[in-house]
Amino acid sequence: MSTNTDLSLSSYDEGQGSKFIRKAKETPFVPIGMAGFAAIVAYGLYKLKSRGNTKMSIHLIHMRVAAQGFVVGAMTLGMGYSMYQEFWANPKPKP
């Protein structure tokens, strides 16, 4: 039984930074969704001190819903953008 140790796959050759940059160019709304999620969570944690009479669980639920809503919105915009590019901006010729 022989083992082939010199497999060279392009996905294993690129580093984490270059892989993230390549993926960000392919799907630009994913990093936007990640950044928005992080920003909403950071803002929610910052406002945790001055939440007033609101229970902590309610505040955290509102923060989670806002962050998830932002991510779903970014995903929807990303799908719309990719559909626009594939079907309207650069349509493939019919055979």
From Swiss-Prot:
Keywords attached to this entry: Acetylation, Electron transport, Membrane, Mitochondrion, Mitochondrion inner membrane, Phosphoprotein, Respiratory chain, Stress response, Transmembrane, Transmembrane helix, Transport
Modified residues (Phosphoserine): S8
TM ranges: 28-48, 69-89
Domain HIG1: 2-93
Modified residues (N-acetylserine): S2
Induction: By hypoxia.
Highest rank taxon of the organism: Eukaryota
First-listed, main subcellular location of the protein, grouped into a coarse class: mitochondrion
Membrane topology, from the record: Multi-pass membrane protein
Alphabetized PROSITE patterns for the sequence: HIG1
Compartments, as annotated in UniProt: Mitochondrion membrane; Mitochondrion inner membrane
GO CC field: membrane; mitochondrial inner membrane; mitochondrion; nucleoplasm; nucleus; protein-containing complex
GO biological process, one term: negative regulation of release of cytochrome c from mitochondria
InterPro entries in the cross-refs: Hypoxia_induced_domain, RCF1
PANTHER family, per the entry: HIG1 DOMAIN FAMILY MEMBER 1A, MITOCHONDRIAL, HYPOXIA-INDUCBILE GENE 1 HIG1 -RELATED
Subunit structure: Associates with cytochrome c oxidase (COX, complex IV); proposed complex component. Also associates with respiratory chain supercomplexes.
Function summary: Proposed subunit of cytochrome c oxidase (COX, complex IV), which is the terminal component of the mitochondrial respiratory chain that catalyzes the reduction of oxygen to water. May play a role in the assembly of respiratory supercomplexes.
Protein name: HIG1 domain family member 1A, mitochondrial
